[in-house]
Amino acid sequence: MSKLFSEYKLKDVTLKNRIVMSPMCMYSVENKDGIATDFHFAHYVSRAAGGTGLVILEATAVQEVGRISEFDLGLWNDEQVPALKHLVDGLHSHGAKAGIQLAHAGRKAVLPGEIVAPSAIAYDEKSAKPVELTKEAIKEVVADFKRAAYRAKEAGFDVIEIHAAHGYLIHQFLSPITNRREDNYGGPAGNRYKILSDIIKAVKEVWDGPIIVRVSATDYAHGGLQLEDYIPFAKWMKADGVELIDVSTGGLVNVAPPVFPGYQVPFADEIRRGAGIATGVLGLITRGEQAEEILCNERADLIIIGRELLRNPYFAKDAALSLGETIEGPKQYSRAWK
């Protein structure tokens, strides 16, 4: 059997294969209330029907002010749970495990009114200047991640991912470019890591399932975080109880990364080896053979697919055929692969 279609365990959760749908914002909550819609159900469940092992929902805000836009999903109140439970049931009906990415946009929120960040530094000259979070407000953010994790449990999710990448709030705390604080949340790396550590520990108080953290392994900017900074961060995450690190890059500043097939694989490889923690990797992985090579060379443990799954919900089915594997799909569509 190919490695790509072997089972993988995240704590007590067994994935049927190593293909993961990357969280990708759809900006499709037209009512602006954070509640998942029929579109979200069709969008995610179709990828489960296509054979994806783990489907991770897009960035889901833990606070209303933490949305990237007014059209984001949310888990800041109980009214948002039932629609997500319905969606999770749909994922499970096709044999996929269900994950959700809990997030706070920080200074990258594009919303009416006040936005917040670790320091009062705007994303760019076109963006609103955020208000620096007080210590009390930081503790409330941590508490809201915990509350959202509890709601995710109520909705039946199998996996929680904490979004600490792409220039959003937690990443803003981690990077010295965006964190100029002089209290115990700023300065040395251990202080800048504190909010993420506090969030992980708070989530674990209500959640006994696997926790993934998405990181940006380089800021692509002078004075920002580089790969070597993430080895100690990853070790601390492992000690805090994180099962796997989802390795991406960039997003903190308005700089386009150099992009080519598998461009983030070296980052996942180095973190995996340097910190002794499992990693998932994404970034222009578009073919089954490419994914298999990454796994067989032990450069990552899970393959996270983004845009290719937008183009092709049946990526898993097609990847299996390319690797000489047979996986079941919806019987209604079986003639498509004869």
UniProtKB/Swiss-Prot annotation:
GO terms for biological process: response to toxic substance. It catalyses: A + NADPH + H(+) = AH2 + NADP(+). Substrate binds at residues 27, 163-166. Its EC number is 1.6.99.1. Keywords: Detoxification, Flavoprotein, FMN, NADP, Oxidoreductase. GO terms for molecular function: FMN binding; NADP binding; NADPH dehydrogenase activity. Its cofactor is FMN. SUPFAM superfamilies: FMN-linked oxidoreductases. It is an enzyme of class 1 (oxidoreductase). FMN binds at residues 22-25, 59, 101, 214, 306-307. It comes from the Bacteria. Catalyzes the reduction of the double bond of an array of alpha,beta-unsaturated aldehydes and ketones. It also reduces the nitro group of nitroester and nitroaromatic compounds. It could have a role in detoxification processes. Homotetramer. Belongs to the NADH:flavin oxidoreductase/NADH oxidase family. NamA subfamily. This is NADPH dehydrogenase. It comes from Listeria welshimeri serovar 6b (strain ATCC 35897 / DSM 20650 / CCUG 15529 / CIP 8149 / NCTC 11857 / SLCC 5334 / V8). The lineage of its organism: Bacteria, Bacillati, Bacillota, Bacilli, Bacillales. The gene is namA.
